[in-house]
Amino acid sequence: MQVARIMGFDIEIAPRANLIRTDQHVAYGIIAQATHSQLARLYSHAKDVLGEVYLPEAVNVQTVDGKWIPAMTYLCPEMEPRQADEEYVERIAAPALKFGFPSWYIDRIDSFRPSRAQSRKG
């Protein structure tokens, strides 16, 4: 797995992780390979159990060494905004820390924790 960033997107976790288009931000993630059946299982779970529909989108991402590569991301075009669950945010924040995402980006992820939600609104 490899760390990469995608320009023109910001992360939002409300209640699940999603990328939102913006001309002022960058989002970080992991490049991973998955089979069609693995992706189908993952996004069927998102739809059937969690109630969210994620759609594939081709993008170009930049690795930490500056190399641009084509990738697929999955976006949820219609997510009803709700408070994220503390454990869910932790499942995103822990790997971000492990893979060495920038500290400001980990702070951004942490800002979606229920314990920090009030400070984000104010």
State where each predicted segment sits.
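Glycine-aromatic micro-motifs
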Residues: M1-G122
